[in-house]
Structures are given as C-alpha cells and as structure tokens.
C-alpha cells in the first residue's frame, strides 16, 4: 500500500509540474504578443488652446497624434465633424470670420473652423501666437516647412502663428 501511495503522489506532482509549465509558457507568450502590438497615438484637447501656459506644443504625443490622423479638438475631427457638431462642442456663438472658395470660416477662442457648403468641418486652424515659446516648441518637433500628409488630412505648421489641419479633398 505504501508503494501505491508513493506512485500516486509522484504522478500527481509530475502532472502538476507539467501543467504548470505549460500554463506558464502560455502566459509568457501572451505577454510578449501584447507588448509588440502598436497602439495608434491619439490626442484630444478640450478648452482654450491659445493661451500663455498651454503645454500641448511641448508634448510629443500632440505631434504624433497629428501625424497619425488622430487629433480631436473639443471632440471635433476635421473631415468627419459637421457645423452642428462645432456649435454643440464650442457653443452657438461662433463668429463668421470670412468666406473663400466655397468654405465659410468661423472663429471662437482663437480657433478657426472651416465649414464647406455641405456643412462639413474641412479646416481647423489653431492659433498659437499667445503660447509661450510656441515658435521654439514647434521647431523642436517639426522640421521647417514640414507638412504631415495623413490618411485624411494635411497638417501645416506656421511657427509662432498657427497650425492648420485641412481635410483632403475626396475624389
């Protein structure tokens, strides 16, 4: 009887070790897989943008999100949002700025929204001239004259002045 007990204990230990090693290897494989998956950078900005203490221009994630076509201001995305979305996000008191080539531009809190004849947000200009060191911050992250050509937008940087996000024309 003693020998049967020893065999049962040895079998249980061997089987437990084998199952534990298999489960452990499986978990290691899953962790390695998760670590290699890339996440698309995004940046959502809410509130007044053009003010002295704004640190967004110093944040590399701000530029990475613009590069990857994944930036939203007050929940608004160029090429997807509508004029109704703009009014809902920033208020009905947007001021008409000017009209050019079928696009009407509205301004609120130093952000200019370009709305096409179909009511779609096709242009967003973030004024940055009031932000401390805006010229240097942009130059630290973007080459002079560089334009981000993303899937649905073009992003142009005018150091010390503005950042323009423009929807690509649909063909």
Question: What do these predicted ranges mean?
Answer:
Residues 119-126, 161-169:
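Short, well-ordered strand-loop elements centered on a beta-strand within folded domains, enriched
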Residues 2-21:
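Sec-dependent N-terminal signal peptides
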Residues 3, 20-143:
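Short helix/turn-capping signatures at newly exposed starts of structured segments
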Residues 148-168:
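Short, exposed beta-strand-loop hairpins at the edges of beta-sheets
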